[in-house]
Regions:
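Short beta->alpha linker loops
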Residues: 130, 200, 329-333
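Short linear Ser/Thr-Pro motifs
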Residues: 74, 107-108, 197, 219
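Conserved AdoMet/S-adenosylmethionine-binding subsite of the radical SAM
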Residues: 144-324
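Auxiliary Fe-S-binding modules of radical SAM enzymes
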Residues: 1-89, 151, 248-256, 262-348
């Protein structure tokens, strides 16, 4: 059966029209309000939509959310969910604490084809894309948990598409999910509160204008193609200069800016020459530089730099006119930090 969460408002209306259900668009809007405004799990009842629509949906669609297999809580209040879909495939989703509010770090694929060498997910390979409904239900599950267990911090969470997978490699399903997240009849989430992270998957990046006006984060990680290709093998196909040129062509409106993500790996990309070349290619660009200390995982060949070396790298950027922040690591004690998601890890 098709998940009700896989439908956009338009496709749900068409779905009901095929069976001559009365007032299909009105019924579709009521279903959307039920799922996303009221966030109720389960089918609607007679009086909300027609009996014919109820009977048809009962035979053709599922109103079930994905199954939560486990929930882990970090000492810093990060929360990691292991979520299972109807075919038995699993992903991890993370609630990340910020002052006054949380963000939900959502996965877009089971595994990932990019095989970035700093990322535990990359060792899993790609098993399949997630559907738009599987992307959406991660958010609903995390928000419901937040309301139950941390109600004082349960304001509508932000979204970061930074979990398992490359979002732009699963473009169509991510696009459908985003349209529901921001739509008036859907979750009504402001576009400024959604950030999509990419390793630089150029075919999807060139279509970025088709998406709602969300924020974008580029996994940069080195200003040199030779080193970046070692960290992100995708760079061999889509080199950095092509990615930056494409990003420069994206019309960022208002005060939106790109987030440049830079994982600091000791002895590989945290040298003085790395900082100086990074400043050279980013000077004058409208963006924010997030320096992310490498987070270890079983089998990793990299090391995390010392606090002193990270501060020195930041200082060089600052002296060259580049504002950069060092991101605070969250959830590393439960393997929920950047680059650590992989549900096959024992104990997840």
């Amino acid at each position: 059966m098709e998940s009700i969460y896989n439908f956009t408002l338009e496709t749900l209306t068409q779905h009901l029209q095929t069976q001559d259900c009365p007032h299909p668009k009105t019924a579709a809007i009521r279903i959307f309000h039920h799922l996303y405004r009221e966030r109720k799990v389960g089918p609607l009842t007679e009086g909300q939509i027609s009996k014919k629509a109820i009977n048809y949906l009962a035979k053709s669609t599922s109103f079930d959310l994905a199954k939560t297999i486990s929930v882990q809580e970090s000492k810093d209040f990060t929360v990691k969910f292991l979520i299972e879909f109807c075919d038995g495939e699993r992903v991890e989703t993370v609630l990340i604490p910020f002052p006054g509010r949380y963000a939900v770090c959502i996965s877009t694929q089971v595994g990932c084809a990019m095989r970035c060498s700093f990322c535990f997910t990359g060792t899993q390979g790609l098993k399949r894309h997630l559907t738009s409904g599987e992307i959406l239900t991660q958010y609903l599950i995390a928000w419901e948990w937040l309301e139950c267990y941390r109600p004082r911090k349960a304001a509508q969470p932000k979204i970061v598409l930074m979990g398992q997978g490359e979002p732009l490699h699963n473009f169509e399903e991510v696009k459908k999910a985003l349209l529901i997240f921001v739509s008036e009849q859907g979750m009504q989430l402001g576009t400024r509160r959604i950030t999509l992270s990419t390793a630089g998957y150029l075919p999807g990046l060139k279509r970025f204008g088709e998406l709602p006006l969300i924020n974008i984060a580029l996994s940069l990680h080195s200003p040199f193609n030779s080193i970046r290709s070692q960290i992100i093998p995708l760079n061999k196909s889509y080199p950095l200069e092509d990615i930056l040129a494409t990003i420069d062509s994206i019309p960022f409106k208002g005060n939106r800016a790109i987030n440049f993500e830079y994982v600091l790996i000791d002895g590989l990309n945290n040298r003085e020459e790395d900082a100086r070349e990074l400043a050279k290619i980013l000077l004058g660009k409208k963006g924010i530089i997030n320096l992310i200390p490498f987070n270890g995982f079983p089998g990793a060949v990299y090391e995390r730099p010392s606090e002193e070396r990270m501060a020195a790298f930041q200082g060089i950027l600052s002296s060259l006119g580049i504002h950069a922040t060092i991101r605070t690591t969250k959830g590393s004690d439960i393997f929920a930090a950047c680059g650590q998601l992989k549900h096959l890890l024992e104990g997840s």
